[in-house]
Design a protein with these regions (language model features):
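His/Met- and acidic-residue-enriched segments that coordinate or traffic transition-metal cofactors
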Residues: 1-62
Length: 62
């Protein structure tokens, strides 16, 4: 069972979620537009890592 979060903590987590989502979207976009395969794969990895962090943060709010 997770402890109750304060309103300030919820706002902080929500802000972090917005940032993680934004970076994941940007990295996904870059992975599709880069012509260098190595850089494109690195951007895919970065996007995946940020998506995982987003999911973890979402889990804290549920």
């Amino acid at each position: 069972m997770q402890p109750k979060l304060t309103a300030k903590e919820v706002v902080f987590i929500s802000d972090l979620m917005n940032l993680e989502e934004s970076v994941a979207k940007k990295a996904t976009f870059y992975s599709k537009t880069l012509t260098d395969a190595t850089l494109a794969n690195e951007m895919k990895t970065i996007a995946c890592n940020h998506a995982k962090r987003y999911a973890v943060l979402l889990g804290l709010l549920q």
